[in-house]
A protein has these predicted regions:
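Extracytoplasmic
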Residues: 2-5, 16, 104, 115-117, ...
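Compositionally biased alpha-helical segments
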Residues: 1-56
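Structural recognition of the beta-strand scaffold that forms the well-ordered cores
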Residues: 264-266, 341-344, 392, 404-406
């Protein structure tokens, strides 16, 4: 691609190099000019199909992801050393928002560590959202310029698929069929190539309709993502551990995923952990692997079993740990290695109120006395059996007897501190690790 008179060259390792146009021979400059003119016309057609001016004559992966996010009106979700993400739950939060002529439910844009666009993942009609009343608007099925509203999930999915296929075919011609994705999320997709990146439209019967935009080289590999070396991963994980003089130790830089209005804490938390461990993941596709029921909800056991092979193929492994009683000394070695622990617990209102208050008042006047009363109270309470939830334990403080927790509810819930007695009150006895 081109940017301000410079040619952007992409190397096999994914890095980019900018070279001034005048350094090229005349015949190369003529070729580049002709290529850019051709792509400029196609970019206009692609943007008209998309509905937003998000694409340019430059290669997708040489663009700053923030520019694409701004063009598509996607709010920033997370900034981390492994890359940033932007996410919009369009069907419930942005009335009238359409992509390729259809209303998406989730739009997620990911960057690499340098901030360049890596992939765009869009989920349209799907079984987890069809018929849901959990904050879901009726906009998805209100197309004033088309046939009658769909009366079933199958009709809704077919409608979205047909609208998207028509938009992309008008812009880029007929698509070609291809198998795409890793084990557990592998599906047949229609593929359109343009300017060294690919648009992949999939309809998985009874599950979902999705569009992904990725580098053509990634599509050529069937969507199978690469693997970061063990040495590089361990170095990155160790560098993510933060320590304070007060005894706080925690894993920093874990990508945030906002699970939105649905009961998708399991796939959202898995996406966070997988990306932290160098494994590509998409919350919505993981939800389908986890057998989300119509209207939302995921079976954690099914999800874990289906993800084992996917994680293993990336040189990682899932490990289950029975932990009827959480003890800081048992958590230390994992946190010290930069590995978060996925934690099954009951997210009770009292727990969250105390977590917020404790995090906001730590070290303040009267805090120690209040915390002592909390410890005494919850050490003798009976365990709750509702509000089942999956989040992360990402830190500890041995001096104060606290653990750091992180929930997939957005930035405010990225890091909270709770006394170990409160954590044990809501503990369900299971921890899960993704290990090198």
């Amino acid at each position: 691609g081109m940017e301000k008179g410079q040619v952007i060259l992409q190397h096999p390792n994914g890095s980019n190099q900018k070279v001034p146009l005048e350094r090229f021979a005349k015949e190369d400059r003529d070729y580049i000019a002709a290529r850019e003119a051709k792509h400029a016309g196609a970019a206009k057609a692609v943007n008209e199909a998309l509905g937003f001016p998000a694409f340019s004559d430059g290669h997708f992966t040489t663009r700053q992801a923030g520019e694409i996010a701004a063009a598509m009106q996607l709010p920033l979700e997370s900034e981390s050393p492994v890359g940033n993400s932007w996410r919009l739950y369009a069907a419930v939060r942005k009335s009238g928002y359409k992509l390729f002529g259809a209303v998406p439910y989730s739009v997620a844009l990911y960057s690499n560590a340098e901030g360049m666009a890596d992939s765009l993942s869009i989920v349209f009609a799907n079984k987890g959202d069809y018929g849901s009343k959990a904050g879901f608007a009726t906009e998805h099925f209100n197309h004033k310029d088309g046939p009658d509203e769909p009366t079933s999930l199958a009709d809704a999915m077919q409608r979205d698929h047909d609208l998207i296929e028509k938009a992309l075919t008008t812009a880029l011609g007929e698509g070609e069929k291809q198998r795409f994705g890793d084990t557990g999320t592998r599906r047949t997709a229609l593929r359109w190539d343009w300017n060294d990146h690919s648009f992949l439209l999939a309809l998985v019967e009874g599950e979902y309709v999705s569009v992904q935009v990725v580098a053509s080289s990634h599509a050529d590999a069937g969507g199978r993502s690469g693997r970061i070396s063990d040495a590089d991963l361990r170095a990155r994980l160790e560098a993510s551990v933060r320590r304070k003089d007060n005894g706080d130790v925690w894993v920093s830089g874990i990508p945030m995923v906002d699970q939105g209005p649905k009961g998708y804490c399991v796939p959202a938390t898995f996406e966070r952990a997988m990306r932290h461990m160098g494994v590509e993941a998409d919350m919505y596709l993981l939800a389908m692997v986890g057998e989300s029921s119509a209207g939302g909800g995921t079976v954690v056991e099914w999800l874990i079993e289906n993800l084992r092979s996917q994680v293993y193929r990336k040189g990682r492994r899932l490990r289950d740990i029975a932990a009827q009683d959480l003890r800081i000394r048992d958590l230390q070695r994992h946190v010290d290695a930069g590995i978060p622990l996925l934690w099954r617990m009951c997210s009770m209102p009292e727990y969250n109120e105390i977590a917020d208050k404790n995090t906001g008042t730590r070290g303040g006047e009267g805090h120690a006395e209040w915390l002592a009363s909390v410890r005494k109270d919850f050490a003798k309470r009976g365990k709750p059996a509702e509000n089942h939830h999956l989040c992360m334990i990402i830190g500890y403080n041995e001096k104060t007897g606290e653990v750091a927790v992180s929930d997939s509810w957005g930035k405010r819930f990225e890091l909270r501190w709770v006394p170990i007695e409160l954590a044990n009150w809501v503990n369900n006895g299971d921890l899960i690790l993704i290990q090198p």
